[in-house]
Amino acid sequence: LCDRLAAEDERIRVFHKKNGGPSSARNFGLQQAGGEYVGFVDSDDYVDADMYERLYGAIEKTGMPVAQVGRDEIDKDGNILPNICEPVATEQVIPAEGFLKELLMHRGDCSFCTKLLRKDLFTIEQFPVGALNEDFHLLVKMLTREESAVPGIACIPGQAYHVFYRPDSNTRDKNRFSRVFADNIDNADMVLALVDRKYPELSEIAFRFGIFQRLDYLLHIPIAQMTGDNAFYRRVVRDLRHGWWRAMKNPWLTKKNKLLLNRLL
């Protein structure tokens, strides 16, 4: 199908490569892209016909290198699921520090699929191959670069990107313990180090994010893997014990979070 469409429209180019995961495919696409801006659409999803036109308009209007629109998720029966991230009500520019704060509070959208980005943002670093939660990893790197490559993100209202929810995806399969929980913790440690250097006023929020990701790991790991020879599991428990007092004083952790921490330890 893709080859046939490419034969009918010279604007479409199709490449065939060995499956190396989403990051590998995206990085390959970035190497082939010839335009000034890039966007990403997952194979199961679809976008409104004017999505990229609206995103480009926001970039032109604000001068920001990145624009974002809201998304919704649709199940296999066509039902719209509750919002993961609430779209903005009005067009606005969210500064890099504010956008990062929203990500760390689990309110922001790290997906590159809802964004249009200037291609040169990927010159320094691209998607981490072999890792899950790769969008969060790269976006945080962009938001915390010393040269302030992304001073802010232009956000427009509406939900123009539509996610087809697959419960058996790499991060959602309930029948196996996804590696994403460990990758989330590694990303949390990375962002804490970056925040301490770039935005120290967000340090306690970043610490809260790391505690939250570790609690999420312990809530999902199978009992059979809670063993002394599981080095990562031992590390998670050790980190929570070492950070317990700071967590108890953290204003961004809820009472429920703190009760859960005490119960799991």
Question: Can you name each region flagged by the protein language model?
Answer:
Residues 38:
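Short aromatic/hydrophobic "clamp" motif used to bind/position activated sugar donors
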Residues 70, 86-107:
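Short, flexible, basic/aromatic active-site loop/helix in glycosyltransferases
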Residues 1-16:
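Acidic donor-binding segment of Leloir-type glycosyltransferases
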Residues 50-83:
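Conserved donor NDP-sugar-binding/catalytic core segment of glycosyltransferases
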Residues 97-184:
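Conserved nucleotide-sugar donor-binding catalytic segment
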Residues 42-46, 65:
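The conserved acidic donor/metal-binding loop of glycosyltransferases
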Residues 1, 17-33:
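Glycine-rich, basic loop-to-helix element that forms the pyrophosphate-binding segment
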Residues 64, 223-265:
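Membrane-interface aromatic/basic loop that binds lipid-linked glycans or pyrophosphate carriers
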